[in-house]
Regions:
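Negatively charged, low-complexity tracts enriched in Asp/Glu with abundant Ser/Thr
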Residues: 1-26
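Short acidic DE-rich linear segments
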Residues: 72-78
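Acidic, low-complexity, intrinsically disordered interaction modules
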Residues: 17-64, 68
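Residues marking helix boundaries in flexible regions
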Residues: 7, 47-50, 74
Length: 78
């Protein structure tokens, strides 16, 4: 399961909110996280953490969890 490809449903299940096309947002008490995806989603994406723009490539839930853990963002539903 942890190596599942990222899909829109998975992002929504993880607490990311679908704001507009190709923009997802996840909020915690201390962080405001936006996960941007382009038309080739999920091959390329940008993670924005407290206004810091971080280009990343994330293909699986495991990779997304690992990346967010580096930035101390706890997503409880993994």
């Amino acid at each position: 399961m942890e190596n599942q490809l990222i899909t829109e449903k998975i992002l929504l299940d993880l607490g990311f909110k679908h704001i507009v096309h190709n923009l997802y947002e996840y909020k915690t008490d201390t962080e405001n996280v936006r996960y941007y995806v382009n038309s080739n989603w999920p091959q390329k994406c940008i993670l924005e953490i407290n206004r810091n723009i971080i280009p990343i490539r994330v293909f699986t839930t495991f990779e997304l969890k690992h990346f967010l853990t580096i930035y101390n963002i706890n997503i409880l539903n993994f």
